[in-house]
UniProtKB/Swiss-Prot annotation:
UniProt name for this protein: Probable tRNA pseudouridine synthase tag-124
Gene Ontology annotations of biological process type: mRNA pseudouridine synthesis; tRNA pseudouridine synthesis
Keyword list, A-Z: Isomerase, tRNA processing
Leading EC class: isomerase
Known EC number: 5.4.99.-
Species this protein is from: Caenorhabditis elegans
Active site: 85 (nucleophile)
Catalytic activity: a uridine in tRNA = a pseudouridine in tRNA
Cellular component aspect of the GO annotation: cytoplasm; nucleus
Role according to the record: Formation of pseudouridine at position 38 and 39 in the anticodon stem and loop of transfer RNAs.
Length: 402
Protein backbone atom coordinates (compact mmCIF):
# COMPACT_ATOMS: atom_id res chain seq x y z
CA UNK A 1 0.00 0.00 0.00
CA UNK A 2 1.44 3.36 -1.00
CA UNK A 3 1.26 6.21 1.49
CA UNK A 4 -0.98 9.20 0.83
CA UNK A 5 0.60 12.38 -0.46
CA UNK A 6 0.89 15.17 2.08
CA UNK A 7 -0.37 18.61 1.14
CA UNK A 8 1.09 21.73 2.84
CA UNK A 9 -1.20 24.18 4.61
CA UNK A 10 -3.01 27.02 2.84
CA UNK A 11 -0.37 29.70 3.38
CA UNK A 12 2.52 27.59 2.14
CA UNK A 13 0.52 26.32 -0.83
CA UNK A 14 -0.08 29.87 -2.00
CA UNK A 15 3.57 30.82 -1.63
CA UNK A 16 4.91 27.73 -3.35
CA UNK A 17 5.21 27.65 -7.12
CA UNK A 18 2.34 25.54 -8.45
CA UNK A 19 2.98 22.81 -10.95
CA UNK A 20 1.70 23.34 -14.46
CA UNK A 21 -0.66 20.41 -14.03
CA UNK A 22 -2.66 19.38 -11.01
CA UNK A 23 -4.40 16.11 -10.31
CA UNK A 24 -7.82 17.45 -9.39
CA UNK A 25 -9.06 13.99 -8.42
CA UNK A 26 -6.58 14.07 -5.54
CA UNK A 27 -8.16 17.15 -3.99
CA UNK A 28 -11.54 17.74 -2.33
CA UNK A 29 -13.87 20.38 -3.64
CA UNK A 30 -16.72 22.59 -2.51
CA UNK A 31 -19.28 24.91 -4.02
CA UNK A 32 -18.76 28.57 -3.25
CA UNK A 33 -20.36 31.88 -4.16
CA UNK A 34 -18.23 34.93 -4.86
CA UNK A 35 -19.26 38.56 -4.63
CA UNK A 36 -17.53 40.93 -7.04
CA UNK A 37 -17.77 44.27 -8.80
CA UNK A 38 -16.68 45.44 -12.22
CA UNK A 39 -16.56 48.66 -14.22
CA UNK A 40 -18.74 47.92 -17.21
CA UNK A 41 -17.34 50.57 -19.55
CA UNK A 42 -14.02 48.68 -19.49
CA UNK A 43 -15.53 45.38 -20.67
CA UNK A 44 -17.68 43.87 -23.43
CA UNK A 45 -20.45 42.70 -21.11
CA UNK A 46 -20.60 40.01 -18.43
CA UNK A 47 -21.30 36.80 -20.33
CA UNK A 48 -18.72 35.07 -22.52
CA UNK A 49 -19.03 35.77 -26.23
CA UNK A 50 -17.30 34.22 -29.25
CA UNK A 51 -16.09 37.50 -30.78
CA UNK A 52 -14.28 39.00 -27.75
CA UNK A 53 -12.05 37.91 -24.88
CA UNK A 54 -12.80 41.05 -22.86
CA UNK A 55 -15.94 39.88 -21.06
CA UNK A 56 -16.06 39.78 -17.27
CA UNK A 57 -16.82 36.06 -17.20
CA UNK A 58 -13.92 35.25 -19.49
CA UNK A 59 -11.54 37.05 -17.14
CA UNK A 60 -13.04 35.17 -14.17
CA UNK A 61 -12.77 31.86 -16.02
CA UNK A 62 -9.10 32.50 -16.80
CA UNK A 63 -8.47 33.49 -13.18
CA UNK A 64 -10.08 30.30 -11.85
CA UNK A 65 -7.97 28.19 -14.19
CA UNK A 66 -4.70 30.08 -13.54
CA UNK A 67 -5.11 29.67 -9.79
CA UNK A 68 -5.93 25.95 -10.22
CA UNK A 69 -9.27 26.41 -8.48
CA UNK A 70 -11.03 24.66 -11.35
CA UNK A 71 -9.89 22.25 -14.01
CA UNK A 72 -12.54 22.90 -16.65
CA UNK A 73 -14.98 25.81 -16.98
CA UNK A 74 -17.70 23.53 -18.33
CA UNK A 75 -17.52 21.19 -15.32
CA UNK A 76 -17.57 23.65 -12.41
CA UNK A 77 -21.38 24.11 -12.29
CA UNK A 78 -21.06 27.87 -12.88
CA UNK A 79 -24.05 30.20 -12.40
CA UNK A 80 -24.35 33.98 -12.26
CA UNK A 81 -27.05 36.18 -10.73
CA UNK A 82 -27.76 38.93 -13.23
CA UNK A 83 -26.65 39.27 -16.83
CA UNK A 84 -25.39 42.75 -17.70
CA UNK A 85 -24.81 44.12 -21.19
CA UNK A 86 -21.75 45.87 -22.57
CA UNK A 87 -21.12 49.13 -20.73
CA UNK A 88 -23.20 48.21 -17.67
CA UNK A 89 -21.41 47.90 -14.32
CA UNK A 90 -22.15 45.79 -11.25
CA UNK A 91 -21.50 45.85 -7.52
CA UNK A 92 -22.29 42.82 -5.34
CA UNK A 93 -22.69 40.76 -8.50
CA UNK A 94 -22.76 37.09 -7.51
CA UNK A 95 -21.53 33.92 -9.17
CA UNK A 96 -21.28 30.35 -7.90
CA UNK A 97 -18.99 27.51 -8.90
CA UNK A 98 -17.38 24.29 -7.61
CA UNK A 99 -13.72 24.87 -6.72
CA UNK A 100 -10.80 23.08 -5.11
CA UNK A 101 -10.75 23.04 -1.30
CA UNK A 102 -8.19 22.55 1.49
CA UNK A 103 -10.70 21.44 4.12
CA UNK A 104 -12.00 17.90 3.52
CA UNK A 105 -13.55 17.82 6.99
CA UNK A 106 -15.72 20.90 6.50
CA UNK A 107 -19.45 20.71 5.92
CA UNK A 108 -20.23 20.86 2.22
CA UNK A 109 -16.78 19.69 1.09
CA UNK A 110 -16.84 16.57 -1.05
CA UNK A 111 -14.71 14.37 -3.30
CA UNK A 112 -15.27 13.55 -6.93
CA UNK A 113 -17.14 10.30 -7.51
CA UNK A 114 -14.16 9.24 -9.63
CA UNK A 115 -11.61 9.69 -6.81
CA UNK A 116 -10.12 6.49 -5.39
CA UNK A 117 -9.09 6.36 -1.73
CA UNK A 118 -5.39 5.99 -2.54
CA UNK A 119 -5.51 9.12 -4.74
CA UNK A 120 -6.58 11.46 -1.95
CA UNK A 121 -4.06 13.98 -0.70
CA UNK A 122 -3.60 13.83 3.08
CA UNK A 123 -4.18 17.39 4.23
CA UNK A 124 -2.71 18.81 7.41
CA UNK A 125 -5.42 19.90 9.83
CA UNK A 126 -4.75 23.63 9.48
CA UNK A 127 -8.44 24.51 9.40
CA UNK A 128 -7.69 27.29 6.91
CA UNK A 129 -9.42 27.33 3.57
CA UNK A 130 -7.77 28.54 0.40
CA UNK A 131 -7.70 32.38 0.26
CA UNK A 132 -10.09 32.47 -2.68
CA UNK A 133 -10.50 36.25 -2.81
CA UNK A 134 -6.78 36.97 -2.64
CA UNK A 135 -5.97 34.29 -5.22
CA UNK A 136 -8.49 35.56 -7.76
CA UNK A 137 -7.67 39.25 -7.32
CA UNK A 138 -4.02 38.40 -7.86
CA UNK A 139 -4.70 37.53 -11.50
CA UNK A 140 -7.87 39.49 -12.35
CA UNK A 141 -7.68 42.92 -14.05
CA UNK A 142 -8.07 45.82 -11.62
CA UNK A 143 -11.43 46.68 -13.18
CA UNK A 144 -12.83 43.42 -11.73
CA UNK A 145 -12.49 42.83 -7.97
CA UNK A 146 -13.76 39.97 -5.81
CA UNK A 147 -14.38 41.12 -2.23
CA UNK A 148 -16.25 38.28 -0.50
CA UNK A 149 -16.92 34.56 -0.75
CA UNK A 150 -19.31 32.12 0.93
CA UNK A 151 -19.61 28.33 1.18
CA UNK A 152 -22.96 27.30 -0.31
CA UNK A 153 -24.95 24.12 -0.82
CA UNK A 154 -24.24 22.05 -3.92
CA UNK A 155 -27.78 22.84 -5.11
CA UNK A 156 -27.23 26.62 -4.84
CA UNK A 157 -27.80 28.61 -8.04
CA UNK A 158 -26.72 32.25 -8.11
CA UNK A 159 -29.57 33.19 -10.45
CA UNK A 160 -32.53 31.17 -9.25
CA UNK A 161 -31.83 31.52 -5.51
CA UNK A 162 -31.64 35.32 -5.72
CA UNK A 163 -34.77 36.88 -4.21
CA UNK A 164 -34.03 40.58 -4.71
CA UNK A 165 -32.08 42.59 -7.27
CA UNK A 166 -31.32 46.30 -7.03
CA UNK A 167 -30.23 48.59 -9.85
CA UNK A 168 -28.95 52.16 -9.66
CA UNK A 169 -28.83 54.69 -12.49
CA UNK A 170 -27.04 58.04 -12.05
CA UNK A 171 -27.56 61.22 -14.07
CA UNK A 172 -27.18 65.00 -13.84
CA UNK A 173 -30.11 66.96 -12.44
CA UNK A 174 -30.13 69.41 -15.39
CA UNK A 175 -33.57 71.07 -15.46
CA UNK A 176 -35.51 67.93 -14.53
CA UNK A 177 -38.63 68.13 -12.38
CA UNK A 178 -37.67 65.52 -9.78
CA UNK A 179 -41.03 65.62 -8.01
CA UNK A 180 -42.88 64.60 -11.17
CA UNK A 181 -40.31 61.87 -11.77
CA UNK A 182 -40.98 60.56 -8.25
CA UNK A 183 -44.72 60.55 -8.90
CA UNK A 184 -44.18 58.49 -12.03
CA UNK A 185 -41.69 56.18 -10.31
CA UNK A 186 -44.18 55.30 -7.56
CA UNK A 187 -46.57 53.92 -10.18
CA UNK A 188 -44.01 51.25 -11.11
CA UNK A 189 -44.20 49.63 -7.67
CA UNK A 190 -46.14 46.37 -7.52
CA UNK A 191 -46.67 43.35 -9.74
CA UNK A 192 -47.26 44.34 -13.36
CA UNK A 193 -46.80 43.19 -16.93
CA UNK A 194 -43.76 45.22 -18.02
CA UNK A 195 -43.76 44.18 -21.69
CA UNK A 196 -43.96 47.87 -22.70
CA UNK A 197 -40.82 48.60 -20.67
CA UNK A 198 -38.39 46.16 -22.30
CA UNK A 199 -36.95 44.92 -25.56
CA UNK A 200 -38.56 41.87 -27.15
CA UNK A 201 -36.77 40.16 -30.02
CA UNK A 202 -37.54 36.95 -31.91
CA UNK A 203 -35.73 34.79 -29.36
CA UNK A 204 -38.12 31.90 -28.65
CA UNK A 205 -37.38 31.75 -24.92
CA UNK A 206 -38.04 35.46 -24.52
CA UNK A 207 -41.26 35.25 -26.52
CA UNK A 208 -42.61 32.48 -24.32
CA UNK A 209 -41.52 33.87 -20.95
CA UNK A 210 -43.78 35.78 -18.58
CA UNK A 211 -43.41 39.55 -18.66
CA UNK A 212 -44.88 39.96 -15.20
CA UNK A 213 -42.37 41.23 -12.65
CA UNK A 214 -42.67 42.52 -9.10
CA UNK A 215 -41.05 45.86 -8.28
CA UNK A 216 -40.57 46.39 -4.54
CA UNK A 217 -39.28 49.96 -4.43
CA UNK A 218 -38.36 52.85 -6.73
CA UNK A 219 -36.56 55.98 -5.49
CA UNK A 220 -35.47 59.16 -7.27
CA UNK A 221 -33.01 61.00 -5.03
CA UNK A 222 -30.66 63.94 -5.41
CA UNK A 223 -27.42 62.48 -4.04
CA UNK A 224 -25.08 65.46 -4.44
CA UNK A 225 -25.34 69.23 -4.75
CA UNK A 226 -23.02 71.12 -7.05
CA UNK A 227 -21.63 74.20 -5.27
CA UNK A 228 -21.75 76.46 -8.34
CA UNK A 229 -24.47 75.23 -10.72
CA UNK A 230 -27.38 73.05 -9.62
CA UNK A 231 -27.84 71.49 -13.05
CA UNK A 232 -24.59 69.58 -12.42
CA UNK A 233 -25.92 68.12 -9.16
CA UNK A 234 -26.30 64.35 -9.36
CA UNK A 235 -29.52 62.33 -9.15
CA UNK A 236 -29.83 58.59 -8.60
CA UNK A 237 -32.66 56.27 -9.58
CA UNK A 238 -32.80 53.11 -7.43
CA UNK A 239 -35.08 50.22 -8.41
CA UNK A 240 -35.47 46.99 -6.41
CA UNK A 241 -37.46 43.98 -7.54
CA UNK A 242 -37.68 40.23 -7.80
CA UNK A 243 -36.21 40.29 -11.31
CA UNK A 244 -36.02 42.42 -14.42
CA UNK A 245 -36.57 42.09 -18.16
CA UNK A 246 -34.09 42.81 -20.94
CA UNK A 247 -33.18 46.54 -20.89
CA UNK A 248 -36.09 47.18 -18.50
CA UNK A 249 -34.26 49.71 -16.30
CA UNK A 250 -32.90 51.66 -19.26
CA UNK A 251 -36.38 51.94 -20.81
CA UNK A 252 -37.77 53.10 -17.47
CA UNK A 253 -35.07 55.79 -17.33
CA UNK A 254 -36.06 57.08 -20.78
CA UNK A 255 -39.70 57.45 -19.73
CA UNK A 256 -38.88 59.08 -16.38
CA UNK A 257 -36.57 61.52 -18.17
CA UNK A 258 -39.40 62.62 -20.47
CA UNK A 259 -41.63 63.04 -17.41
CA UNK A 260 -38.87 65.03 -15.69
CA UNK A 261 -38.48 67.24 -18.76
CA UNK A 262 -42.27 67.76 -18.56
CA UNK A 263 -42.81 66.37 -22.04
CA UNK A 264 -45.09 63.73 -20.49
CA UNK A 265 -47.20 63.40 -17.35
CA UNK A 266 -46.47 60.86 -14.57
CA UNK A 267 -49.69 59.08 -15.58
CA UNK A 268 -47.86 57.82 -18.70
CA UNK A 269 -46.44 55.03 -16.49
CA UNK A 270 -49.93 53.75 -15.64
CA UNK A 271 -51.00 54.01 -19.27
CA UNK A 272 -48.05 51.92 -20.48
CA UNK A 273 -48.82 49.30 -17.82
CA UNK A 274 -52.36 49.08 -19.22
CA UNK A 275 -52.08 46.61 -22.11
CA UNK A 276 -55.59 47.49 -23.27
CA UNK A 277 -54.51 51.06 -23.91
CA UNK A 278 -51.05 50.09 -25.20
CA UNK A 279 -51.17 46.47 -26.47
CA UNK A 280 -47.64 46.97 -27.82
CA UNK A 281 -44.75 49.27 -26.95
CA UNK A 282 -44.62 52.76 -28.49
CA UNK A 283 -41.33 53.41 -30.25
CA UNK A 284 -38.90 55.10 -27.88
CA UNK A 285 -35.15 54.89 -27.40
CA UNK A 286 -32.99 53.12 -24.86
CA UNK A 287 -31.16 55.19 -22.22
CA UNK A 288 -27.36 55.11 -22.12
CA UNK A 289 -25.65 52.03 -20.65
CA UNK A 290 -22.74 53.67 -18.75
CA UNK A 291 -24.72 55.12 -15.79
CA UNK A 292 -26.40 51.77 -15.01
CA UNK A 293 -25.17 49.50 -12.22
CA UNK A 294 -26.55 46.20 -10.93
CA UNK A 295 -25.93 47.27 -7.36
CA UNK A 296 -27.05 44.34 -5.22
CA UNK A 297 -28.14 40.71 -5.44
CA UNK A 298 -30.02 39.51 -2.35
CA UNK A 299 -30.24 36.00 -0.90
CA UNK A 300 -31.71 34.37 2.18
CA UNK A 301 -29.27 34.62 5.09
CA UNK A 302 -29.48 30.87 5.65
CA UNK A 303 -28.34 30.27 2.06
CA UNK A 304 -25.37 32.64 1.92
CA UNK A 305 -23.12 33.89 4.73
CA UNK A 306 -20.45 36.10 3.21
CA UNK A 307 -16.85 35.96 4.40
CA UNK A 308 -14.89 39.21 4.13
CA UNK A 309 -11.20 39.53 5.05
CA UNK A 310 -9.83 42.91 6.17
CA UNK A 311 -6.59 42.79 4.19
CA UNK A 312 -8.17 42.08 0.82
CA UNK A 313 -11.03 44.51 1.50
CA UNK A 314 -8.63 47.33 2.41
CA UNK A 315 -6.61 46.68 -0.73
CA UNK A 316 -9.78 46.79 -2.84
CA UNK A 317 -10.93 50.05 -1.23
CA UNK A 318 -7.52 51.64 -1.85
CA UNK A 319 -7.63 50.68 -5.52
CA UNK A 320 -11.19 51.96 -5.95
CA UNK A 321 -10.29 55.24 -4.24
CA UNK A 322 -7.54 55.79 -6.80
CA UNK A 323 -9.99 55.19 -9.64
CA UNK A 324 -12.54 57.52 -8.04
CA UNK A 325 -9.91 60.24 -7.56
CA UNK A 326 -8.90 59.93 -11.22
CA UNK A 327 -12.46 60.46 -12.48
CA UNK A 328 -13.13 63.26 -9.97
CA UNK A 329 -10.01 65.13 -11.09
CA UNK A 330 -11.07 64.79 -14.72
CA UNK A 331 -14.61 65.87 -13.83
CA UNK A 332 -13.38 69.00 -12.04
CA UNK A 333 -11.16 69.88 -14.98
CA UNK A 334 -14.15 69.77 -17.33
CA UNK A 335 -16.32 71.73 -14.89
CA UNK A 336 -13.77 74.55 -14.98
CA UNK A 337 -13.86 74.52 -18.78
CA UNK A 338 -17.67 74.49 -18.86
CA UNK A 339 -17.83 77.38 -16.41
CA UNK A 340 -15.65 79.52 -18.65
CA UNK A 341 -17.30 78.53 -21.94
CA UNK A 342 -20.91 78.96 -20.82
CA UNK A 343 -20.05 82.43 -19.55
CA UNK A 344 -19.01 83.51 -23.03
CA UNK A 345 -22.52 83.38 -24.54
CA UNK A 346 -26.18 83.42 -23.59
CA UNK A 347 -27.86 80.01 -23.56
CA UNK A 348 -31.56 79.26 -23.56
CA UNK A 349 -32.81 76.84 -20.90
CA UNK A 350 -32.96 74.03 -23.46
CA UNK A 351 -29.48 74.66 -24.86
CA UNK A 352 -27.91 74.95 -21.40
CA UNK A 353 -28.93 71.39 -20.50
CA UNK A 354 -28.85 69.81 -23.95
CA UNK A 355 -25.66 67.78 -23.51
CA UNK A 356 -26.81 66.41 -20.14
CA UNK A 357 -30.07 65.14 -21.63
CA UNK A 358 -28.45 63.77 -24.77
CA UNK A 359 -25.99 61.73 -22.69
CA UNK A 360 -28.81 59.91 -20.92
CA UNK A 361 -31.01 59.60 -24.02
CA UNK A 362 -27.93 58.39 -25.96
CA UNK A 363 -29.06 60.33 -29.05
CA UNK A 364 -29.53 63.93 -30.24
CA UNK A 365 -32.61 65.59 -28.77
CA UNK A 366 -35.16 66.13 -31.59
CA UNK A 367 -36.30 69.69 -32.19
CA UNK A 368 -39.97 68.62 -32.24
CA UNK A 369 -41.05 66.28 -29.46
CA UNK A 370 -43.60 63.58 -30.36
CA UNK A 371 -45.81 62.56 -27.46
CA UNK A 372 -46.10 58.84 -26.70
CA UNK A 373 -49.78 58.75 -27.66
CA UNK A 374 -48.84 59.87 -31.18
CA UNK A 375 -45.88 57.56 -31.75
CA UNK A 376 -45.68 54.54 -34.00
CA UNK A 377 -46.05 51.20 -32.25
CA UNK A 378 -43.63 48.28 -32.17
CA UNK A 379 -44.84 44.89 -33.30
CA UNK A 380 -46.91 43.31 -30.53
CA UNK A 381 -45.78 40.32 -28.49
CA UNK A 382 -48.73 38.27 -29.76
CA UNK A 383 -47.82 39.03 -33.37
CA UNK A 384 -44.23 37.93 -32.77
CA UNK A 385 -45.45 34.71 -31.14
CA UNK A 386 -47.61 33.97 -34.18
CA UNK A 387 -44.66 34.55 -36.51
CA UNK A 388 -42.48 32.24 -34.43
CA UNK A 389 -45.15 29.52 -34.45
CA UNK A 390 -45.52 29.85 -38.23
CA UNK A 391 -41.76 29.68 -38.69
CA UNK A 392 -41.53 26.51 -36.60
CA UNK A 393 -44.46 24.98 -38.48
CA UNK A 394 -42.86 25.69 -41.85
CA UNK A 395 -39.58 24.27 -40.61
CA UNK A 396 -41.25 21.04 -39.48
CA UNK A 397 -43.07 20.71 -42.81
CA UNK A 398 -39.80 21.16 -44.70
CA UNK A 399 -38.16 18.46 -42.57
CA UNK A 400 -41.00 16.04 -43.30
CA UNK A 401 -40.43 16.47 -47.04
CA UNK A 402 -36.76 15.53 -46.81
Amino acid sequence: MGSKRVCPDANNSVKSKKAKTLDFLAHPRRKIAIQFFYLGWEHDGLVQQPHTQNTVENHIMQALIKTHLIEDWTKCDFSRCGRTDKGVSAFKQTAAMVVRSLCPGDSGVFWSDSTQEHQKVDYKASGEELPYVKMLNGVLPKTIRVFAWAPVAQTFNARFDCNRRTYKYSFAKADLNLEKMRQGAELLVGEHDFSNFCQIDMNEKRLLQSYVRKVYEVKVEQVSTHPENDMYSMVELTVSGSGFLWHMIRYIVTILQEIGRENEQPSLISQLLDLKKYPSRPQYTLASDTPLCLFDCGYKSEDVEWKVHDYTLKSTVTGLQKTWATYQARSRMMENMLGELTGMAEFSSGDANKGLHEFVQDRPIPSNYIRFENRKMCESLESKKEKMAEKKKNGEESSDKL
